[in-house]
From Swiss-Prot:
This protein's name: Small ribosomal subunit protein bS6
GO molecular function: small ribosomal subunit rRNA binding; structural constituent of ribosome
Cellular component GO terms held in the UniProt record: cytosolic small ribosomal subunit
GO biological process: translation
Family affiliation: Belongs to the bacterial ribosomal protein bS6 family.
Keywords: Ribonucleoprotein, Ribosomal protein, RNA-binding, rRNA-binding
């Protein structure tokens, strides 16, 4: 059976519970068509690079699917009808990845960032609070610039 990676974006004003309900609905469509969903990953609410249907943020969800093309086409048709789905993309793959996706690994890495400092005090140059300018010298005196065409 063909394998697919499917990502869809749901509107930000939809609750996480409603997104889970949508996933269950689409899972039912795939299973009715004779396929299975191997993995579901919710990437959470993320900012979009540009506005899509007047939304600046969206719930991102990944589905790894093993199903006949007709079942995937029916799921995509239902997503096109739904007002809560902003965008979706389905890609056929040779093999599904067993480990967490890059987005989940990135989230895990971001979660570890805060615990690295432990109970050590803040550094002097944290948060642009100053610090050494490295090997850059002083800018020195600069001539006044004239922008009005006046000489």
């Amino acid at each position: 059976m063909p394998l697919y990676e499917h990502v869809f974006l749901a509107r930000q004003d939809v609750t996480a519970q409603q997104v889970e309900t949508m996933v269950e609905t689409y899972k039912g469509v795939i299973e009715t068509g004779g396929g299975t969903i191997e993995k579901i990953e919710s990437w959470g609410v993320k900012s979009l690079a540009y506005r899509i249907k007047k939304n600046r943020k969206a719930h991102f969800t990944l589905l790894n699917i093993s199903a006949p093309p007709a079942a995937v086409a029916e799921m995509e048709r239902q997503m096109q009808i739904s007002e809560d789905v902003l965008r979706f993309m389905t890609v056929r793959v040779e093999q599904l990845e067993a480990e967490p996706s890059a987005m989940m690994q990135k989230r895990d890495r971001d979660d570890r960032k805060d615990r690295d400092r432990g109970d050590r005090p803040r550094r002097r140059d944290d948060d642009f609070g100053g610090g050494d300018r490295g090997d850059r010298g002083d800018r020195g005196d600069r001539p006044e610039r004239n922008f009005g065409g006046e000489n």
